[in-house]
Amino acid sequence: MQEQYRPEEIESKVQLHWDEKRTFEVTEDESKEKYYCLSMLPYPSGRLHMGHVRNYTIGDVVARYQRMLGKNVLQPIGWDAFGLPAEGAAVKNNTAPAPWTYDNIAYMKNQLKTLGFGYDWSREIATCTPEYYRWEQKFFTELYKKGLVYKKTSAVNWCPNDQTVLANEQVIDGCCWRCDTKVERKEIPQWFIKITAYADELLRDLDKLDHWPDTVKTMQRNWIGRSEGVEITFDVKGYDNTLTVYTTRPDTFMGATYLAVAAGHPLAQKAAANNAELAAFIDECRNTKVAEAEMATMEKKGVDTGFKATHPLTGEEIPVWAANFVLMEYGTGAVMAVPGHDQRDYEFASKYGLTIKPVILAADGSEPDLSEQALTEKGVLFNSGEFDGLAFEAAFNAIADKLAEKGVGERKVNYRLRDWGVSRQRYWGAPIPMVTLEDGTVLPTPEDQLPVILPEDVVMDGITSPIKADPEWAKTTVNGMPALRETDTFDTFMESSWYYARYTCPQYQEGMLDSKAANYWLPVDIYIGGIEHAIMHLLYFRFFHKLMRDAGMVTSDEPAKKLLCQGMVLADAFYYVGENGERNWVSPVDAIVERDEKGRIVKAKDAAGHELVYTGMSKMSKSKNNGIDPQVMVERYGADTVRLFMMFASPADMTLEWQESGVEGANRFIKRVWKLVYEHTAKGPVAALNVDALSEDQKALRRDVHKTIAKVTDDVGRRQTFNTAIAAIMELMNKLAKAPQEGEQDRALLQEALQAVVRMLNPFTPHVCFTLWQELGGEGDIDNAPWPVADEQAMVENTTLVVVQVNGKVRGKITVAVDATEEQVRERAGQEHLVAKYLDGVTVCKVIYVPGKLLNLVVG
């Protein structure tokens, strides 16, 4: 064994061994308990960042630990390879998205291998290949035949710069999340999947997810947004149709003083024909933000349509306004307004001088003061005719019943969740497998024409999708008739909604999934990824699993038993102000810093001498130029050091602060383990451990070893507090380094301890542990070695600490045998000099003894 720890030599050698032996390739094995460990697949952006490294290190630690427990562990990896960034990069680099993507995959695959992740590379998937998306296309046509897919014209967020539709979540402050262009509203025909048909089950089954973070479950509950209420129909004078509204507060119905409709509502359109002010307002609303969070904060505006609706219970005429806070695609595109008891309605009514009628009493039973704001709490009704005096629940039921009796209302369950719009007007995505005949008939692409292959050899102009720009591409024939293919492509969330299932049978050619393999591996035992995916990806992921279950492909109801959301990686951020007042962000690697005695940064400059402003720790990002390249760190310290730091610096679900001093500390620790193994093995062969022959000191050390095994097993396995597991191993290493190594049993004990330490560290630092296991004469490869098991006998304490008091005051502590009698404890206490001086020349009148804990001597 060489004396110096040289990671660059060890790591490449061990990685080559794993590759040649195909160590992490697995197949179904009914005789073994399976464990499916999955990290969210990366987008091949070109380089791994520290967020990736953290995510995949956590996954690899879990997978390697479960493997050492003797389980059949599947840990696959792939590439979420479609998406808009590839189009931008292709235009910029004068290439096509496909070669750019495949080059990035090759580069990043190499980076993953350098970090020593134990993936089953035989199952690698790239979602942009026809071998993958063909099954998604086929499944979509089957969902269409089942009535779960439909096309409708819908208002979308349109980014005029990217020429594409944005999801509500991609609109930030009314602008495109990617290019910051002002977003417009546009009506276009789009394909939708009926996720609302599964809303109740998606909500209900959250209760089955005992090992998902509550924050994620709460976000999904709110996103699905189930509510119970009443749908009410209003007659409108001079308008051919009725208006329908939905309310969760029918108890306030007698206080409804106006209705509001969306600018795109047919009633508003009709009124605008001879109302120039309204027509201009409708035009302005075309650029209204559609994200709900934005809707809440924007200024509420409206125009009176001139139409009057009849209140179905009072018969009063109430005005109908067009308002910018009502959206056509939410509910019916019309709402009833109760300004006395809804703050938004109150602000709008106050602004435009509309009637505000209170119908709910304040908590103290008095009429509410509505001079400054609405009373939104539930309470007892007044000013409501026959319903006066009723509290919320009774009023809800009485008014709902009355409306139903009159044929103008019915109870309804509503959801905030909208159907999933899967059409994207971009090129680099899977083509949607639908065709339109010359007579306008829309059909799914026939199975013998699947997959609809996306041409990869294209020229990007950065504006129009190449498959939209080429009229020939869309032409096809169906049943002998000319037809045009759909030129929209799928939302990339489609690919990431089912990849986890395809990993179980990536080479399967007979269909989307091989049920036998899928049902052996699924559900995923642990899924690791960022909390930013809580409502989009993680909801579609659950939805797709239920679709596949209902198609008979899988038997489980949910895709993943446990979800671990890792925290973000933060780093120091610095900038200097340029000549034009702009901020120039400087990488923390290039910042020369001065610190105070507490280690806080007080001054910084860069190599060019610019005084730098330190903004503290923030998420690693391109915009602040504070990302640390994992590759540079691996080259400097080795993959094992980077991995160990990642797992030690912070609990997995908390933010991690990148500190190079911490990385150096992790590196020093690995060197200490190496040095101790080197010194130990250099002394030659080791005798067998004879537990019965150990001295008290040796037994105490062995007790520490086995207590550490027990703690680390619990921390890594049950609690998943990996940082405390590493801390416990470090503490044990300190004791082992100080332990005597002279006697035969000293060395035998150290051999047992080091073999345990190396196996416990193996999930974290697999390369160095692979090597040290061989040097310690471990059996076979460490990858197939069992996790160490704590010896219960070794952990039994044979001594205990007894506190000695004289007249109730603590005067000393003594170590005695666990089975010592009261006499022996008293005798031992008398020999303790700190205690003895208080007993000199006095009489002990009374002895209070709590066995194994406390001895109190009362003296006179």
Curated annotation (Swiss-Prot):
PROSITE patterns: AA_TRNA_LIGASE_I
Keywords from the named record: Aminoacyl-tRNA synthetase, ATP-binding, Cytoplasm, Ligase, Nucleotide-binding, Protein biosynthesis
CDD domains the UniProt entry points to: Anticodon_Ia_Leu_BEm (cd07958), LeuRS_core (cd00812)
Keyword Magnesium: no
Coiled coil: none
Main location: cytoplasm
Subcellular location: Cytoplasm
Family stated for the protein in its record: Belongs to the class-I aminoacyl-tRNA synthetase family.
Gene Ontology CC entries for this record: cytosol
EC number: 6.1.1.4
SUPFAM superfamilies according to UniProt: Anticodon-binding domain of a subclass of class I aminoacyl-tRNA synthetases (SSF47323), Nucleotidylyl transferase (SSF52374), ValRS/IleRS/LeuRS editing domain (SSF50677)
Pfam family, one: tRNA-synt_1
An MF annotation (GO) of this entry: leucine-tRNA ligase activity
NCBIfam families: leuS_bact
GO biological process per UniProt: leucyl-tRNA aminoacylation
Name used for this protein in its record: Leucine--tRNA ligase
UniProt motif ('HIGH' region) ranges: 42-52
Positions of short motif 'KMSKS' region: 619-623
Binding site for ATP: K622
Catalytic reaction(s) noted: tRNA(Leu) + L-leucine + ATP = L-leucyl-tRNA(Leu) + AMP + diphosphate
